[in-house]
Amino acid sequence: MDAGESCGLFLGATTSVFDTRAMDFWDIARDAKMGVAANQTAESIAAQPAEFRQIVGSGADVATVAEFGAKVFASEVLLTNLGNLSFDRQFGPVTLEAIFGPAVLAGFEGQQTIGVTTVNGALCLLHTSHTPQEGLLEKTQSVLTQACDYRL
């Protein structure tokens, strides 16, 4: 892969709470983006692992760590987004058609994760769960398709 300094492990979590009754899709998306923006600063990103190290490093028992994780990762649905990626599609005889992910499970019962990646202009969605909610991926795709068609 020869990724060099372009490869790393980046972890973080933030929660966005919004009222879906009064807004259309794009208003919700803007509201969610504003809700997580404060946690996207370098200071906030650096502080998140420090909080975890403080809990784990103090010799906390399993129940304390589980309670901390449940609080930090509490959500109805987890949405992960790698953003808009652009790179070569051809790797010798192999052509990259899509990338699906990220596939994330925080380990909570009933957790539903939608991983979003846009590669060379193609939106790719992945539903990850130990107990997948039937139709969630299809509904997500439908909502996104309608929202994007509306903007055109």
Residues covered by each model-derived region:
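Acyl-thioester-dependent acyl-group transfer interface
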Residues: M1-L152
